[in-house]
């Protein structure tokens, strides 16, 4: 039998991937995580809105309206959920959509909430339909409607819940059902970060890690971090390793540049995977337009990986366009690879 490559097999984590790579990285993220809105850097519009809504809820002595946070991974949705709970002065219970398999799983969480507590559900777009159905009355009326028993003996039991705030986070807002989306009173989209905000985040993390780093070093890391704080902090740790060996632990612009070049992260934050994708569109498909399935087959990646991991940053940075006819490389992509621009 012919052996074929398993394109869905687990692959090594990219250093510029926005997803959390390991439990160890998760622990370090928690240590570097800001605790208040004042400490939270960037996302100025979302932060300003949340500050007003939180103050208003506290002034009235009410639970904050349910909050939906959406945007690409690594931009601070989990951090904001923790900050919301801290600013409100209440407890936070955290779970994720895939974990809540049965209605009873959600019921157990909801019935253990104290008044005004925050329930944070990450990947809320992955809730099962059964769980989502019992969530509706909980969000609207602070009430659980649970069916007990089966067949003719089945009966509905209503359980009153304390007022609470659901904070849902998702990278795929389009996958939320309309009834669920409509039950969020506050909806905030998190955007990719500006380099100046990322440089501030890198400098703050360096201080917490007690690193000797110049302003130029922070800026060099920031501009290659793909607009994502999680990536910036990961690159900072790898640059720290390089500096410990090559420069007695001091991180300046030159050391940061040398370290990141060694890691194949170029000045635009593109890594080998990004360049492979763009080169396929440019060289194998004449710059496009090309269908997603075709380019996925050409580079040996799943369409989900391309849509969720590779494309968002390339589109945001103007290297790629999505058109009704397929993906197309932009003028900036041609120039980045030193190619003549197609007219």
Curated annotation (Swiss-Prot):
Main location: cytoplasm
KW Methyltransferase (keyword) present: no
Catalyzed reactions: ATP + H2O = ADP + phosphate + H(+)
Keyword presence, Ion transport: no
GO BP annotations listed: DNA recombination; DNA repair
Keywords noted in UniProt: ATP-binding, Cytoplasm, DNA damage, DNA recombination, DNA repair, DNA-binding, Hydrolase, Nucleotide-binding
Lineage: superkingdom: Bacteria
Domain remarks: Has 3 domains, the large (RuvB-L) and small ATPase (RuvB-S) domains and the C-terminal head (RuvB-H) domain. The head domain binds DNA, while the ATPase domains jointly bind ATP, ADP or are empty depending on the state of the subunit in the translocation cycle. During a single DNA translocation step the structure of each domain remains the same, but their relative positions change.
Subunit description: Homohexamer. Forms an RuvA(8)-RuvB(12)-Holliday junction (HJ) complex. HJ DNA is sandwiched between 2 RuvA tetramers; dsDNA enters through RuvA and exits via RuvB. An RuvB hexamer assembles on each DNA strand where it exits the tetramer. Each RuvB hexamer is contacted by two RuvA subunits (via domain III) on 2 adjacent RuvB subunits; this complex drives branch migration. In the full resolvosome a probable DNA-RuvA(4)-RuvB(12)-RuvC(2) complex forms which resolves the HJ.
Protein name in the entry: Holliday junction branch migration complex subunit RuvB
Organism the protein comes from: Neisseria meningitidis serogroup A / serotype 4A (strain DSM 15465 / Z2491)
Lineage, opening ranks: Bacteria, Pseudomonadati, Pseudomonadota, Betaproteobacteria, Neisseriales
